Amino acid sequence: MNTQILILTLVAAIHTNADKICLGHHAVSNGTKVNTLTERGVEVVNATETVERRTIPRICTKGKKAIDLGQCGLLGIITGPPQCDQFLEFTADLIIERREGNDVCYPGKFVNEEALRQILRESGGINKETTGFTYSGIRTNGVTSACRRLGSSFYAEMKWLLSNTDNAAFPQMTKSYKNTRNEPALIVWGIHHSGSATEQTKLYGSGNKLITVGSSNYQQSFVPSPGARPQVNGQSGRIDFHWLILNPNDTVTFSFNGAFVAPDRVSFFKGKSMGIQSEVPVDTNCEGECYHNGGTITSNLPFQNVNSRAVGKCPRYVKQKSLLLATGMKNVPEIPKKREKRGLFGAIAGFIENGWEGLVDGWYGFRHQNAQGEGTAADYKSTQSAIDQITGKLNRLIEKTNQQFELIDNEFTEVEKQIGNVINWTRDSITEVWSYNADLLVAMENQHTIDLADSEMNKLYERVRRQLRENAEEDCTGCFEIFHKCDDDCMASIRNNTYDHSTYREEAMQNRVKIDPVKLSSGYKDVILWFSLGASCFLLLAIAMGLVFMCVKNGNMRCTICI
């Protein structure tokens, strides 16, 4: 029992005030919450937004060849109604359509017009070439009051073919055009549906009318349908415009006996452009690459929540209004000095959770105390290593989204040319895919950033531990108690990775021998106390048994066993 009293006295009497160096990381009082693959609302030191929500309410055209069609509808640049006379040939990389724009003058429609619009929006402008068609025995100057210039006129790029005189027979004719260029040609023709059978006879003579159009990959016959219809622009008749893309060295042939609106010129495309439908004004003083009906999106972010129908070099549209990308480490706000001890590598996460709000010069750093006082310094090497790996995360995220979604976008662009309005449904489906992938990509990057920051912290800890070796002891709070006097120069050598443990080894070993026997945690004290108590009890029992045995042997004690 005297042994127990001696140990307790030594523990209470001997006190160590060793020099100490601690490792920690930058922290802020209020961080930003992000989502990772495994957890939502993880607080980090800093983060950046990846979803653009702002737009410029103007069409920015600085540095671009932009064409504002105004009252001219996009399809009108092919046929040439009066409102489109100034746009029959042009070059542009941005085509702006307005709601007031009209494709026709004489009432009618374009067949498969959405596909044709898509082609023209991407055309880069057009130039034209005459078909070279000549006619005899008919009139080629049909006009209408619906298409007015100085007076009645017609589509500038079309010929309205009529009988030589009213009610006269229209002769059977065949006309052919061969595309001799090394690029596709766009050819448009019309079928006239008169307001009545009487009007059709007056214009084209009596009898059934038939128009046949054929090329190597196109064959179609048309029969006009005369009949009463509501008047539009003073006309009850209609013209249906049809079109085809004629490949190089291919020939298209038209056979007809009336009710045919013939092409006078064919169109060729000049390059690449994009088209937008918008009512906002044009601004030649600002630049842009991404447009929508409400203006221009100027952003380097990978995603946008402005408009799902934006065109050009645009961030990908997602449903989320915000997706924060972590650009800093996990935030652990600084705890007051009398804080609960945290485990180091014994903890589940293995992360040194020492957040220091005063560490502003770097992500990772040191605090020390010695005879000269206390100090704090950042570790620039580990900080730079982490920054180098995190810098460019936003650009890498943009690359991932472009590579992942561009193929889908191109695939559905082809579908749009074929089935027109079905693209509205497919785009909604694509938005769902983009939104899911955006969420996943940002969460993956955030997970990587946090894991990376943890890794750099642990690397720094291991670097210090390997330097100090047996000259110091870990205290399970991210600190090392040093068993020798370590002035500011010594502390600097630990931080700079130039510490020589052999220089201080002898002093450290001497101090370790003095400190170790009495530097016991409460758990070890309990073990020693119980061991000492057990040993004392065993010794007393052995003495008692020895006395009993001697008494029995000498006859001073008798033991009787009764059964």
From Swiss-Prot:
Signal sequence bounds: 1-18
* Residues in the Cytoplasmic compartment per record: 548-563
Disulfide bond listed as a keyword: yes
Annotated source species:
Influenza A virus (strain A/Chicken/Victoria/1/1985 H7N7)
Q: Which cysteines are joined by disulfide bonds?
A: C22-C479, C60-C286, C72-C84, C105-C147, C290-C314, C486-C490
State the encoding gene. HA
Annotated lipid attachment (S-palmitoyl cysteine) = C559, C562
Query: Which parts of the chain does the record assign to the membrane side Extracellular?
Result: 19-526
* Protein name as catalogued: Hemagglutinin
Which keywords does this Swiss-Prot/TrEMBL entry list? Clathrin- and caveolin-independent endocytosis of virus by host, Clathrin-mediated endocytosis of virus by host, Disulfide bond, Fusion of virus membrane with host endosomal membrane, Fusion of virus membrane with host membrane, Glycoprotein, Hemagglutinin, Host cell membrane, Host membrane, Host-virus interaction, Lipoprotein, Membrane, Palmitate, Signal, Transmembrane, Transmembrane helix, Viral attachment to host cell, Viral envelope protein, Viral penetration into host cytoplasm, Virion, Virus endocytosis by host, Virus entry into host cell
Purpose of the protein:
Binds to sialic acid-containing receptors on the cell surface, bringing about the attachment of the virus particle to the cell. This attachment induces virion internalization of about two third of the virus particles through clathrin-dependent endocytosis and about one third through a clathrin- and caveolin-independent pathway. Plays a major role in the determination of host range restriction and virulence. Class I viral fusion protein. Binds to sialic acid-containing receptors on the cell surface, bringing about the attachment of the virus particle to the cell. This attachment induces virion internalization either through clathrin-dependent endocytosis or through clathrin- and caveolin-independent pathway. Plays a major role in the determination of host range restriction and virulence. Class I viral fusion protein. Responsible for penetration of the virus into the cell cytoplasm by mediating the fusion of the membrane of the endocytosed virus particle with the endosomal membrane.
Mind telling me which GO cellular component terms the entry cites? Answer: host cell plasma membrane; membrane; viral envelope; virion membrane
Which GO molecular-function terms appear in the entry? host cell surface receptor binding
Which BP terms does GO give this entry? Answer: clathrin-dependent endocytosis of virus by host cell; fusion of virus membrane with host endosome membrane; fusion of virus membrane with host plasma membrane; viral budding from plasma membrane; virion attachment to host cell
Q: Which residues cross the membrane?
A: 527-547
Q: Where in the cell is it found?
A: Virion membrane; Host apical cell membrane
- Record-linked InterPro entries: Capsid_hemagglutn, Hemagglutn_HA1_a/b_dom_sf, Hemagglutn_influenz_A, Hemagglutn_influenz_A/B
Q: How does it sit in the membrane?
A: Single-pass type I membrane protein
Query: Which family, according to UniProt?
Result: Belongs to the influenza viruses hemagglutinin family.
Post-translational modification remark: Palmitoylated. In natural infection, inactive HA is matured into HA1 and HA2 outside the cell by one or more trypsin-like, arginine-specific endoprotease secreted by the bronchial epithelial cells. One identified protease that may be involved in this process is secreted in lungs by club cells.
Whether Lipoprotein counts among this entry's keywords is yes
